[in-house]
Amino acid sequence: ACNTATCVTHRLADFLSRSGGMAKNNFVPTNVGSKAF
């Protein structure tokens, strides 16, 4: 399992990028991750 915010954020970003290509362009984990969550 993945419990840390960083890990969850990256997994979420990866999931979104696989589900819809546009999500990857609108979501930047390195810049928004910690603030978005």
Swiss-Prot record:
Domain of life: Eukaryota
PROSITE patterns hit by this protein: CALCITONIN
This protein's UniProt keywords: Amidation, Disulfide bond, Hormone
Coiled coil residues, start to end: none
GO BP, one annotated term: adenylate cyclase-activating G protein-coupled receptor signaling pathway
Pfam families reported for this sequence: Calc_CGRP_IAPP (PF00214)
Disulfide bonding pattern of the chain: C2-C7
Positions bearing Phenylalanine amide: F37
Alphabetized InterPro entries for the sequence: Calcitonin-like, Calcitonin/adrenomedullin, Calcitonin_CS, Calcitonin_gene-rel_peptide, Calcitonin_peptide-like
Gene3D superfamilies per the UniProt record, alphabetical: 6.10.250.2190
GO cellular component: extracellular space
Keyword Disulfide bond: yes
Single Gene Ontology MF annotation: calcitonin receptor binding
Biological function: CGRP induces vasodilation. It dilates a variety of vessels including the coronary, cerebral and systemic vasculature. Its abundance in the CNS also points toward a neurotransmitter or neuromodulator role.
Family as reported in the entry's similarity comment: Belongs to the calcitonin family.
PANTHER family for this protein: CALCITONIN GENE-RELATED PEPTIDE 2, CALCITONIN-RELATED
Name this protein carries in UniProt: Calcitonin gene-related peptide
